[in-house]
Curated annotation (Swiss-Prot):
GO terms for biological process: adenylate cyclase-activating dopamine receptor signaling pathway; behavioral response to cocaine; chemical synaptic transmission; G protein-coupled receptor signaling pathway; imaginal disc-derived wing morphogenesis; instar larval or pupal development; learning or memory; neuromuscular junction development. Residues 42-385 form the G-alpha domain. Preferentially expressed in the nervous system and in the eyes. Belongs to the G-alpha family. G(s) subfamily. Residues 276-283 are annotated as: G4 motif. This is G protein alpha s subunit. It comes from Drosophila melanogaster. GO terms for molecular function: G protein-coupled receptor binding; G-protein beta/gamma-subunit complex binding; GTP binding; GTPase activity; metal ion binding. Residues 1-14 have a biased composition (Polar residues). GO terms for cellular component: basement membrane; cytoplasm; heterotrimeric G-protein complex; neuromuscular junction; plasma membrane; postsynapse; presynapse.
Amino acid sequence: MGCFGSPTSKQSDVNSEDSKSQKRRSDAISRQLQKDKQLYRATHRLLLLGAGESGKSTIVKQMRILHVDGFSDSEKKQKIDDIKKNIRDAILTITGAMSTLNPPVALEKKENEPRVEYIQDYASSPDFNYPPEFYEHTEELWKDKGVLQTYERSNEYQLIDCAKYFLDRVSTIKNPNYTPNEQDILRCRVLTSGIFETRFQVDKVNFHMFDVGGQRDERRKWIQCFNDVTAIIFVTACSSYNMVLREDPTQNRLRESLDLFKSIWNNRWLRTISIILFLNKQDLLAEKIKAGKSKLSEYFSEFNKYQTPIDTGDAIMESNDDPEVIRAKYFIRDEFLRISTASGDGKHYCYPHFTCAVDTENIKRVFNDCRDIIQRMHLRQYELL
């Protein structure tokens, strides 16, 4: 008779193979977890914080332009509706404010009154489809001195920053073959609600940037992003010194930003996380200071006695900069630094930079300057420095 293995022996072989297979799977999972852990630890996580309309989302767009593949033609075309909405919101807001300002503003040309009626009566409809006459009325109104005077008083009501930019470009945007350029994409205003993550790589270093809505009712979501953050990039609109919040017309926007920065700086969960401070919208700040219509001292009396520091720190003073503009931007910088130096615990630091988020070269230079700072923060985070 032939020899046959016993049932017990066969079962033992099967169990042995199962055990080996399970071990191989376990080892593979362990290796993958180790790789994931290494990748996680090698990734710089940047949290963009700041009050609403400070320019955070524009910074994210710049990262896409500089470090990803920018925006495809199809993505650009998808922004056309948002850009048209920016034009509609701008002309609706400006013409609507003419009668509510104190003192009110009258149209220069009486024949433009039907145009205003059209804008207010029809363009305000949610299903408005932007017929050719809308652009014609908008272009003619934008030439009216009364409308322009109302625009110049935009700190007295709520108007998007990109209003002038897009109203100046109506003749281009109304073209059926129009495709937005990068500057159009950068300036297009869309309210950020929720948390948006952008991933990119610079010199083989991985970055994850989280953009969170800055309006008051969005800030409760911030706590979800605080875990394992390498650094916070706090963005403030320096040009907002003469403006009030959309959600609270009694609160100055720049003071709100200072209060928000203080609450983040002193947050007990963030006491070891340094902040890179983007003092944004320097172009708009310079325009306002040079125009002289809204003096910084009228909103911040401390500015009257402020002297520009001899040591200008990390910013480059251009030879053609207006001395009053220089004094204004350093005053705002020092208001934030006064908060960051008050604690003096040495556990985290504030690194200020003057920025113009719609200027790609400026953001490229500033972010390159920040990379070494971010790397040091990352090494310190994992106790490698």
